[in-house]
Curated annotation (Swiss-Prot):
This is Large ribosomal subunit protein bL32. The gene is rpmF. It comes from Burkholderia ambifaria (strain ATCC BAA-244 / DSM 16087 / CCUG 44356 / LMG 19182 / AMMD). Residues 1-59 are annotated as: Disordered. It holds the Pfam family Ribosomal_L32p. Transmembrane segments: none annotated. One of its GO terms (biological process) is translation. HAMAP family: Ribosomal_bL32. Keywords: Ribonucleoprotein, Ribosomal protein. GO terms for cellular component: large ribosomal subunit. SUPFAM superfamilies: Zn-binding ribosomal proteins.
Length: 59
């Protein structure tokens, strides 16, 4: 099992943890309907990049 040789200072510990924060997922707006969805995913009403690609129950 790995064991550290020297104690890491609070400054170095903070630098190590500086990239561990969570980021918000980027959202996209569907140009034809104005609906918000995850990027590179089909919107809930079946549109992707302005075109109808999936049939929904209402169609």
């Amino acid at each position: 099992m790995a064991v550290q040789q020297n104690k890491k200072s609070p400054s170095k510990r903070g630098m190590h943890r500086s990239h561990d924060f969570l980021t918000a997922t980027p959202l996209a707006v569907e140009p034809s309907t104005g609906e918000v969805h995850l990027r590179h995913h089909v919107s809930p009403n079946g549109y992707y990049r302005g075109k109808k690609v999936v049939k929904t129950k209402n169609d």
